[in-house]
Amino acid sequence: MSDAPELTVLIPFHNEAGNVIPVLEEVHDALGEITFEVICVNDASHDATEAELVEATARWPDTVRVFNHVERRGKSAALITGLRAARGEWVQLLDGDGQNDPHDTARLWPSFTGANADPRLGLIAGRRNSRNDGGFKWLQSRLANGIRRFALKDDVTDSGCGFKIMRTEAFRELPYFASMHRFFPALIKRAGWKVREELVNDRPRLAGKSKYGFLGRLGAGMVDLFGMMWLVRRGRPGIAREWDDPRA
């Protein structure tokens, strides 16, 4: 891994035993035409996730890198850990449960890296083409997305989709706070970059169960939304651009 890759695939894992190897197999199968690295962040799992990640580094020593949190810090902290180590110009965020499809990355890649790509594009946000959730979960997601979109004007309709591709430069400009991963589109817009939404595939998780319950998601989400509204509307810093900055 001496040369910098074009893409860093960043995957947080917490208690995803049974998912690690299948997810990484699919990443390697889908992205064969792109130079990439995979950064896996183990957020203090207490199942066989760590052992499977050790197996992965032995199987793909040229592409897979693993970072272990000593104690659980949450998804946003895991993403920041991976970001600090990312070497690609773009960072692909995938969930560790296999619901996101890396073949969508291969399909979209020419549209944001080719000769006619928009230099001001900071984020491609996935919008799930066919949700694999039950009726109640689908309803709460629609409601939450509508409230968030009205409050933040972030140009996306499905912020809960874990599939996101970000320009690494833009990612590194974002302020860190717990649960920031819920608001990447709004944060990217706040920093002066463009956001684009694309339809992506959605599948049932491969193994295990979701880590998020309805009440916990609702309570934390509302508190974070109020804080994010303040940040977007009152906390925007003065932004200086060099002459060749694409956002100038």
Question: What does each model-identified segment do?
Answer:
Residues 19, 135, 139, 214-217:
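Juxtamembrane loop-helix boundary motifs flanking transmembrane segments in multi-pass membrane proteins
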Residues 1-133, 169, 173, 186-190, ...:
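Structured catalytic core of nucleotide-sugar glycosyltransferases
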Residues 143:
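Active-site Tyr-X1-5-Lys
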Residues 1-6, 146, 153, 177-248:
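Hydrophobic helical membrane-anchoring modules
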Residues 128-138, 148-163, 181, 190:
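A recurrent flexible, glycine/aromatic-enriched loop bordering the glycosyltransferase active site
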Residues 87-89, 146, 150, 160-174:
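Conserved nucleotide-sugar donor-binding
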